[in-house]
Amino acid sequence: MIAMGAKGAGYARGASKQNYATPACLIEPVKAMLGIKRFAFDFAADRFNAKADDWWTERDDSLVKTPQDWLDAVGTGWGWLNPPFNDITPWARRCRQLQRLGGSVAFLVPASVGANWHRDWVHDKAYVLFLNGRIPFMPDKPTWGYPKDCYLALYTPGRHAGYDVWSWRED
């Protein structure tokens, strides 16, 4: 997970409420659902929390990269993106731009269906899976979850936009 910097994307770990790494207990079911063994690229990571073998860091600044740069990074595989939750608009826009170029990305965000970014860049453009159950972003506190519901927006060519609920946990 990343936090915003002055120039755009900043990638930092820490206690900020906007800055949580995606736990493996979610990543593994996502990969299984997508039918992949690994993500091709993580668009917002650092060496401690990357969900792919390749990623962009704060110095790389994902949001100043072009949509073509994003496509070149992900290739024909799936990208992963867990952006900072404080300013989602530029990230959602870039996911849509990647999709229009033929790329695929799984985008983890709060389920803020009333937000402008959702209306403009997700609603009729991505396949949305509402996550059944809160995500435990802090692994040392198994009962702690992000205080809001989240969803996974799947941007990929050829898949119709829509909504569903996904029970990702093994309960």
Residue ranges and their predicted role:
Residues M1-D171:
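Class I S-adenosyl-L-methionine-dependent methyltransferase catalytic core
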